[in-house]
């Protein structure tokens, strides 16, 4: 079973995809626009995304490029009515992993999804080890004492950034930039909320506070 994010502005096609995927045993988040796609991506941590190019608020290729520039590595399957070879090259160059040309059979979508997941699972794992903390960069997972801590995508991004800078203060602005590359979307209180949630989740597995607030400077990850 996979968690699938479907980003398709055509309501009938979006519903058809959602029903077919659910009937195949998958969990599905479906939306018509890029803004809500970002929300589902960050909060529900899908395994794969199916993205149409003609979205109402942002071009699908732009959305994929933005994800890739933020180091979001989940497999992306594009739905496109563009059949020219130049269009297909542009789709793959944007960071998409594969594409299906409209009109299509749902069986082809399912087969390409499965192929992408098999290919993605074969990638070599990259791990940062600061015992007892471990960050799996491929899976985007944080483990403490070999127990995986369930984090949202935003929480994981914060934690990875802090651990990469182990022993160094990371400014609030730097963390906000990791979460919100678009300055217009930044919310100053978000970091404080995320830090509070992170501390609670970590302390359930590790009794010491490893995230320190350095007044006027930022946040510090350090084992004591």
From Swiss-Prot:
It is found in: Cytoplasm. The keyword Phosphoprotein applies. Its main location: cytoplasm. One of its GO terms (molecular function) is transcription cis-regulatory region binding. This is Virulence transcriptional regulatory protein PhoP. The gene is phoP. InterPro entries: CheY-like_superfamily, OmpR/PhoB-type_DNA-bd, Sig_transdc_resp-reg_receiver, WalR-like, WH-like_DNA-bd_sf. Pfam families: Response_reg, Trans_reg_C. The modification 4-aspartylphosphate is found at residue 52. GO terms for biological process: regulation of DNA-templated transcription. PROSITE patterns: OMPR_PHOB, RESPONSE_REGULATORY. Residues 3-117 form the Response regulatory domain. Member of the two-component regulatory system PhoQ/PhoP which regulates the expression of genes involved in virulence and resistance to host defense antimicrobial peptides. Phosphorylated by PhoQ. The keyword Cytoplasm applies.
């Amino acid at each position: 079973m996979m968690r699938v994010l479907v980003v398709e502005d055509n309501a009938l096609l979006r519903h058809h995809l959602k029903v077919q995927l659910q009937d195949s045993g998958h969990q599905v988040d479906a939306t018509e626009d890029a803004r809500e796609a970002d929300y589902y991506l960050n909060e529900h941590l899908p395994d794969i995304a199916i993205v149409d190019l003609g979205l109402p608020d942002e071009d699908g290729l732009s959305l994929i490029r933005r994800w890739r520039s933020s180091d979001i590595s989940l497999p992306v399957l594009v739905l496109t009515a563009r059949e020219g070879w130049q269009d297909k090259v542009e789709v793959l160059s944007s960071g998409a992993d594969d594409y299906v040309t409209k009109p299509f059979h749902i069986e082809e979508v399912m087969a390409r999804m499965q192929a992408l997941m098999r290919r993605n699972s074969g990638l070599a794992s990259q791990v940062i080890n600061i015992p007892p903390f471990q960050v799996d960069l491929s899976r985007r997972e944080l483990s403490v004492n070999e127990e995986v801590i369930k984090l949202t995508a935003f929480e994981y991004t914060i934690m990875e950034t802090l651990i990469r800078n182990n022993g160094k203060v990371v400014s609030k602005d730097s963390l906000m930039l990791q979460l919100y590359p678009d300055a217009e979307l930044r919310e100053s209180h978000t970091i404080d909320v995320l830090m509070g949630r992170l501390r609670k989740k970590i302390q359930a597995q590790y009794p010491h506070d490893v995230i320190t607030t350095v007044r006027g400077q930022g946040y510090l990850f350090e084992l004591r």
